[in-house]
């Protein structure tokens, strides 16, 4: 059984994340979504909320592809998480050159720690390349409409936190 690990904070999960999840699920029999517990980032949504959002969003992808998709919180080294879940590959999404530079360093370190686990990069689809959870939260916080970047369920969660989008007087 081929097991892949797609790690991230997913605060919140975006259409870009879901695109990578959908495409990664065709490469493996089981896709583990590693939900990072990163206390330094100060997430907007709790770990439980992020896991629940991912489980809800991934159910349809799992049904569509036949791939088992599970959310798995982790707080240890990524390579240790990969070992813990039996992953033979770590899947990473790339949006831009800046992502590649960071990921290139991570691959080098992870290979030194365990060279039996490969890293597979999937380029974000063009329509998702600008999407970042950090920017989605900022748009929502400032009263903008996040509809183009997240699913309706995630949008509702953001509206619960920040209120509905404000109408721009210039429109």
From Swiss-Prot:
Subcellular location: Cytoplasm
Record's protein name: Phosphopantetheine adenylyltransferase
Function of the molecule: Reversibly transfers an adenylyl group from ATP to 4'-phosphopantetheine, yielding dephospho-CoA (dPCoA) and pyrophosphate.
Organism lineage: Bacteria, Pseudomonadati, Pseudomonadota, Alphaproteobacteria, Rhodobacterales
Functional pathway: Cofactor biosynthesis; coenzyme A biosynthesis; CoA from (R)-pantothenate: step 4/5
Organism encoding this protein: Dinoroseobacter shibae (strain DSM 16493 / NCIMB 14021 / DFL 12)
GO biological process: coenzyme A biosynthetic process
Enzyme class label: transferase
InterPro entries documented for this protein: Cyt_trans-like, PPAT, Rossmann-like_a/b/a_fold
Entries under NCBIfam families matching the protein: coaD_prev_kdtB (TIGR01510), cyt_tran_rel (TIGR00125)
Cofactor: Mg(2+)
Coiled-coil blocks: none
Predominant cellular place of this UniProt entry's protein: cytoplasm
GO molecular function, one term: ATP binding
The enzyme's E.C. designation: 2.7.7.3
Keyword ATP-binding assigned: yes
Keyword Acetylation: no
Record-level GO cellular component terms: cytoplasm
């Amino acid at each position: 059984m081929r097991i892949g690990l797609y790690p991230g904070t997913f605060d919140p999960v975006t259409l870009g994340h879901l695109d990578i999840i959908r495409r990664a699920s065709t490469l493996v029999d089981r896709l583990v979504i590693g939900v990072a517990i990163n206390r330094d980032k100060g997430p907007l949504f709790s770990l439980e909320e992020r896991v629940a959002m991912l489980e809800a969003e991934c159910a349809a992808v799992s049904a569509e592809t036949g791939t088992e998709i599970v959310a798995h919180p982790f707080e240890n080294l990524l390579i240790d998480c990969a070992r813990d879940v039996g992953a033979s590959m770590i899947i990473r999404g790339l949006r831009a050159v800046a992502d590649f530079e960071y990921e290139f360093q991570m691959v080098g370190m992870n290979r030194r720690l365990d060279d039996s686990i490969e890293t597979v990069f999937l380029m974000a689809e063009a329509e998702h390349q600008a999407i970042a959870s950090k920017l989605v939260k900022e748009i929502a916080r400032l009263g903008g409409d996040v509809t183009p970047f997240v699913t309706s369920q995630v949008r509702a969660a953001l509206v619960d936190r920040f209120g509905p989008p404000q109408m721009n007087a210039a429109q």
